[in-house]
């Protein structure tokens, strides 16, 4: 935080300020880590599989310390992208340009979302050539996302993230089948 407001780590300070650091043990830090891990995972999927073969990667719901999602195919994600410390860049573009960008990338859900957006500008994040939209802050580069695992789960995958109280430890809990079934049915019903 800079003078009590959340700021991204790559912002330059131009005046004396009161600084306090956010960690993954707090809500704001954990959400930043979570968004960044999802973004890194999406980049890895698109790096491994040609874009035209991916119809959609869908992030569905939180399950314990993991995020459940689905895509067609068995796609491995390794740690090479994380270790490369690729910068996560943010740029602000016109909303109409965002509609065009996501249409070009085949991200039709986001293309439709921005057609109805009233704000004139949209923040787009990129890792290398891969671009996407996220609401909220991101880490400055991929090396910050050190602790995660990606495991198969039902028809999709579970992106396991660190336990909030111990940000260097990723648990591999057994999936509670009844809870999964309820969340999955609920998500499908609302889709």
Across the structure, where does each feature detected by a protein language model lie?
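Auxiliary tRNA-acceptor-end handling modules of aminoacyl-tRNA synthetases
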Residues: 3, 11-32, 44, 53-191
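Short amphipathic alpha-helix segments
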Residues: 37-50
């Amino acid at each position: 935080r800079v003078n009590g407001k959340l700021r991204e780590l790559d912002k330059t300070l131009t005046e004396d300020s009161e600084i306090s650091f956010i960690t993954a043990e707090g809500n704001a830090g954990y959400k930043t880590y979570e968004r960044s891990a999802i973004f890194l995972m999406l980049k890895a999927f698109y790096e491994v599989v040609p874009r035209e073969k991916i119809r959609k990667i869908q992030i569905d719901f939180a399950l314990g310390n993991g995020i459940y999602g689905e895509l067609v195919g068995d796609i491995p994600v390794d740690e090479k992208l994380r270790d490369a410390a690729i910068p996560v860049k943010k740029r602000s573009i016109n909303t109409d340009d965002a509609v065009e960008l996501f249409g070009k990338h085949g991200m039709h859900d986001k293309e439709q979302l921005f057609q109805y957006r009233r704000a004139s500008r949209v923040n787009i994040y990129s890792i290398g050539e891969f671009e996407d939209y996220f609401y909220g802050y991101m880490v400055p580069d991929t090396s910050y996302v050190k602790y995660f695992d990606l495991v198969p789960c039902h028809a999709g995958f579970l992106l396991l993230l660190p336990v909030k109280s111990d940000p260097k430890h990723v648990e591999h809990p057994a999936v509670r089948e009844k809870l999964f079934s309820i969340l999955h049915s609920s998500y499908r019903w609302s889709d």
